[in-house]
Structures are given as C-alpha cells and as structure tokens.
Amino acid sequence: MKSLRTLLKLARRDLETLRRALAEQIARQTALQDRILGHEQTIKDEQRAALRDYESGRAYGGYAAAALAVRRALAAEHESVGVEIDRLRALIAEAHVETRKFERLIELEEARLKVQREKREDAALDEMATMRLGRRR
C-alpha cells in the first residue's frame, strides 16, 4: 500500500512537471507569435518607406531578402514549438491515465482492507454473542 502511494506521488510529480513544461512552451509560442506580428509590422513599415524614398527603395531589396529569411526562421520555430506542445499534451494525457490508475488501485486496496476489517469485527461480535449465549444456559 505504501508503495502505491509513493508511485502515486511520483506520477503526480511527473504530471505536474509536464504541465509546467507545457505552460512554458505555450508562453514561448505566444512570444513567437508576438515576434512574428512585430516582424510583419516592421516589413510593412519598410515597404512604406521604400515607396516614399528612392534610396530606401534601392536598399529595400536587400532588406526584403533578409526579412524573408527571418520570417522563415520564425515560422519554422513556431512550427517546432507547436509540435512540442502536441507532444507534451499527449504525454500529459498518458501521465493522467497513469495517475488515475494508481488512484484506482489505492481505492481498491482501501476497499479490500475495509471488507477485511468488517469481517474481523463481525467475527469478534459473533464470538462474543456465542459466549454470552453459552453463559446464559
């Protein structure tokens, strides 16, 4: 019984660790989305500046190539974080099932011990009643 409780504690700790990792990855994904939106806004600002000024227009070609590379890198990182989030969600589901198994085993063990205890009490009461009845005769 003690080992089941220890295993339950470990399973809960693992589940909590996975939940924290998921929260970190979600925060990372949110930060990446903010960076992507900021980068898109910067590209739009540079496009407007390139339309206003001839020199800016000439320099925009190099900037556009670099901006495209940054956009691809951010998109790839966003995708990898999404994959990691999906993986962590699957691990959390598995860890939750495992935790529930230990909880159920503990419940069954406690129910079994309760039945044994009630049987012992009933046997003791029956013995006392038999002894009492024997004394009356």
Question: What are these regions, as identified by a protein language model?
Answer:
Residues 1-137:
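Charge-rich amphipathic alpha-helical interaction elements
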